């Protein structure tokens, strides 16, 4: 972890198709992950649930109101696929999600093999910093490297960033390894970082450079390149 549309056939057909991005909405993919701007409130809640368990929060350090605290609800959400219409799902969760104007982009990730919610990716397009997390069922399978490679791709090819940055706790060997496998290299940065829950931890930093960069139409007006 770093800071920073109940049937299988139906779920697959409702997934965003990789290609040109629409205004305010982005889609990126790797070999095993499809990541996209949430389409529904369910997508958004599943993205949050993916990083709400105790193991993830050891590293992420979100505030209590920023996580899905109920373990049974987390498990239910992370067994689902976009487009599922389970009777247990509240109707308001199927309402469309409209992206805001915040500096940070949030993408929800699903596995391409079974369509299950599996990850979340963030990119702050003012600082060029990316971050993300995997659901418990997606950890230990090399998906972290794909997730961070997607973060670099989003920064370089969607927002025109020359450099994408990432930071993690110094003792988080799994995250450091995933960043290195994704093509990030060690970089200078503050020796400590304060998590959102107030904990101060030792930090280590990475950067990802690129050749030609580009901006997709979903990125809106031009911004300074980081």
Each predicted region: which residue ranges?
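Exposed regions on extracellular, virion, or secretory-pathway luminal proteins
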Residues: 101, 113, 172, 179, ...
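Conserved GNAT acetyl-CoA-binding A-motif
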Residues: 157-167
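Conserved catalytic-core motifs of GNAT/GCN5-like acyltransferases
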Residues: 165-167, 185-202
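Conserved acetyl-CoA-binding loop-helix of GNAT-fold acetyltransferases
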Residues: 134, 140-155, 173-181
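GNAT-family acyltransferases
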Residues: 1-137, 158, 199-226
């Amino acid at each position: 972890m770093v800071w920073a549309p109940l049937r299988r056939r139906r779920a697959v057909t409702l997934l965003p198709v990789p290609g040109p991005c629409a205004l305010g909405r982005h889609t990126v993919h790797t070999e095993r992950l499809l990541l996209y701007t949430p389409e529904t409130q369910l997508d958004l809640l599943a993205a949050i649930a993916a990083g709400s368990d105790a193991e993830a929060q050891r590293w992420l350090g979100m505030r209590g109101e920023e996580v899905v605290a109920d373990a049974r609800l987390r498990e239910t959400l992370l067994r689902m696929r976009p487009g599922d219409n389970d009777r247990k799902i509240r109707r308001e969760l199927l309402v469309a999600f409209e992206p805001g104007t915040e500096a940070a982009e949030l993408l929800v990730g699903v596995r391409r093999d079974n369509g299950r919610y599996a990850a979340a990716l963030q990119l702050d397009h003012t600082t060029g910093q990316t971050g993300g997390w995997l659901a418990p069922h997606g950890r230990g399978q090399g998906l972290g490297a794909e997730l961070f490679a997607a973060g670099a791709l989003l920064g370089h090819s969607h927002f025109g960033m020359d450099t994408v940055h990432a930071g993690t706790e110094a003792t988080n060997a799994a995250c450091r390894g995933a960043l290195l496998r994704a093509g990030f290299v060690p970089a200078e940065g503050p020796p400590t970082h304060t998590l959102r829950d107030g904990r101060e931890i030792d930090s280590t930093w990475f950067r990802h450079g690129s050749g030609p960069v580009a901006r997709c139409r979903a990125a809106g007006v031009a911004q300074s390149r980081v």
